[in-house]
Amino acid sequence: MRMIGRGGAYVPTGDSSVAGTEGFVGNVLTSDPVRYVRNAAIMEQEPSLGLGAPTVAWADAAMRQMNQFAEHSYSASIRQPILMVAAGRDEVVSTPAIETFGQNLLAGRHLILAGSKHEILQEQDQYRAQFWAAFDAFVPGTPRF
């Protein structure tokens, strides 16, 4: 569809409905009910802050990039220091793929937060604390709080 000028169309079964505004139970974003409800209320007030379904062009670009990321030589060629933090209970993206990518980094580190869902910084404090501890250890000169 991208090739015939329909890249801006939503993927099949997708639409502009804002994700993350349905009920808390069964959501794939966070296990923190307070942050989830707060974010849903914000997006209901201002839908332009939310995300709908991906477009065909976005999905095409993502698939191309994932294929490149899957090549061992790609991650092994990265020389910049990278900290990758992934959610252990992520249902949006592949945590095993992130872990494989991270294992091949020469100058990077990866951390899987067991129990965390997709939106790590919108998670319960126990997961956020693990993220910030890893961040503070990774970034030189980060002040301790």
How would you label these PLM feature ranges?
Residues 1-50:
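Alpha/beta-hydrolase-fold enzymes
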Residues 61-64, 100, 130, 134-137:
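Alpha-helical elements of Rossmann-like donor-binding domains used by nucleotide-donor carbohydrate transfer enzymes
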Residues 108-145:
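Catalytic active-site module of serine/aspartate enzymes centered on a nucleophile-bearing elbow/loop
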